[in-house]
Amino acid sequence: MRIKRKFLKEAVAKCAAGVEAGTGLAQAGKVIFVPGYIMGIGTSINVRVPCADVDCSFMVDKAALDKALSKSSDDIDIIRDENRIIFKYGRSRLALPFADIPPTLALFPEEWGQAPADFIRKIRSVAFPNKTGYAGVAWDSDAYAGLVSTDSVRIVVAGCADLPGGAWLPDTAVAALIKAGSECTGIVNDMPYIHVRYADGTVCSVLYRSVSDFPVGPLCQYIDAFDGGSIVTEGELGEEALDAIKGAEGFTDVFDAQVPVHISFAPGSLNVRAENAGGEFYGEAEWPGEYTGHFTVDARPFNAMKASAKAILKMVDGNIALEIRDGDVRVLLSPDP
């Protein structure tokens, strides 16, 4: 079989990047070829890149393959004989011993479920990759939630009825799903794995756990509690808050940064203070509500406000709940002392 060198190099790198986002390689430093795919395998994450030219199954050392790929600009012919794999490029040849892949890796879903079109976007919207204590993402039939082990659920985003209920993905699995691609086209629940297929044909398989294993308990309790909370005030917070943050002199890229945003409410106005490596920056805006108080939140909910200016503050078991109704983001916060 003949494979384009550039494609093979990119495919191997993509597999490695996805797997390295996980908990380490189960088959350390190996690249696996199975019919139709090039694959990297980790202890809880598998990444497969489609390659129609692969017509047999074998496993080779990644470092040796990388060396071959770095020495040639030619397409690579791959020949398998009884006990070795021969990579032929130009006038050079590289013969590598190979191992048969574990039989379980040959299994692959034949039927794909209909995936929510915005699955990766919603997973990303509740992930806190740089947040201390970030544990991962959970979902049930009603919602996704970002989980922080030190203070339970931080952000909840509604809607994921097509996924297996009560699943929890550790932070490493979430990172792998996000790295693998952005547009999801199919999902298979293959307990204990979820296989996610992307628009370019890449497949990322991640090991999930039951949400009951996480100390926050059933996710639905948080959804129900939020829906039953009492409204403190309601107003057009979104655009004003955005203007307050963006208008602070010297503050840039707040929406892409993992920074805390401090919000102080007073009748008729709100004050926003944000921090990054360059210092502290301030902004003010009008607020039509009567709520008085202060809390801290990551910048991500304000990013969601780009799609909606409606915001509602609720009291849920002594916590402040900020809901961006049309933007589909819910945040459970504890008021700052």
Regions found by a protein language model. Give the residues of each.
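Structural preference for solvent-exposed beta-strand-turn elements
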Residues: 1-337
